[in-house]
Amino acid sequence: MFNPVELEIELFCRGMRIDASCEVEADGRRLARTRAGLGSGLELMLPAPRKPIWVNVPVVERFAEASPLRLIKDGFGYGVLDERDGAVYPVEVPEEPAWYSRLTSSGVPMCRIGVLQGNYLGVYVSNACLFWASKPPRACRFCTTGKNLGVNEQPRKNLEDVVEVALAARDESGSVFTHLNTGYHFEDVDKLEPIHGLRQCEPFVRAIRERVGGFIGVQAFPVPERLFCEYDALIEAGADHFSFCYEFEDPETFARLCPGKAETLGQEGFFRAMEYTAKKLGPGRVSGEIIAGLEPIEATKRGIDRIVAAGAFPTVCIFRPTIGSDLENAPPPDPKAMRDVFAHLWEACRDADLPVGVLPIEVSLVVQAEETRDLVKPTFGSRLYDWKLAALRQVARPYVAWKRRPRAA
């Protein structure tokens, strides 16, 4: 049988079929093809010794139809049946928040403004990434943002709507983290600074800080070094966290699958911004995001090390061939290779003494760093690291309570 993190990786890589005995439409959250499309799966919670593991399981993609993993339901609840050996893993299907079906004061369904992915709120605040509008399109080949905006979510978000949804997520779902993201908006063109993603996020960050509270993260296309004042302005407005999707360490894979990013700032531009914000905000406040399963595994490991060396922590997404992307027919990654990647992730975080898993933020779209400890044989050093993280979680509780309160930036 698999341990919880191994099962999580299996579910990400193989997807899952849903048995006729299940009533997920009534019992669970709706499938949310928002933002880049990674939330296209069914949200599950896997029991684990330290805390439940959230996972957004692929169920609609083509590869999931052949999965040996099947969600079943009986009188005791839900479970995942592995048809290869007959093992059944109990799981929980979290119910959909009541606020998903309510309307904002402007009449928009709240779930078209933002959705929970784990216990955090994700909001795409701007219109579609402009790489989709170039001719020929220069969008990342694995992304579906340009096809989701305006169909599965509002194409442009009203500030008041976002605040109302963030309040509902805080008060009714216990969310402590709001994550705002945008795509490319001519960040390499100085005279178009007013439409840069960071500038578009600024009023949302300020309003959420002053009226909602909690932790606020921003993911936007990096600006060149001469415009790093845009990061300073967002920090002043109340941003706590920045994430940078540089996607691939292998230069050939990066250029082939991320043509827009390669032709504008390139990989180095992402790292310059990552290093700058990591120095401004401190350890644990900046992440570099990389995709595992499309480039050589050793390149992904080097990318993890490079992110750590930049003063950030690595967020590793397992490649999902989402419907509507150029790569929708590509095979998903091998789970064994992914276990190798995430074992390396744990060792890199441990060796750098990164404060992972300190805040009560659960992300269902990725295998979180703190979950990967069970992929590595315990040593005295890893136990010491675990003890330190446990102590930090206790120390952080008053800070989390303070951050949850709205305040002027």
Task: Spell out what each predicted region is.
Residues 144-164, 169-230, 234-273, 285-287, ...:
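Core AdoMet radical
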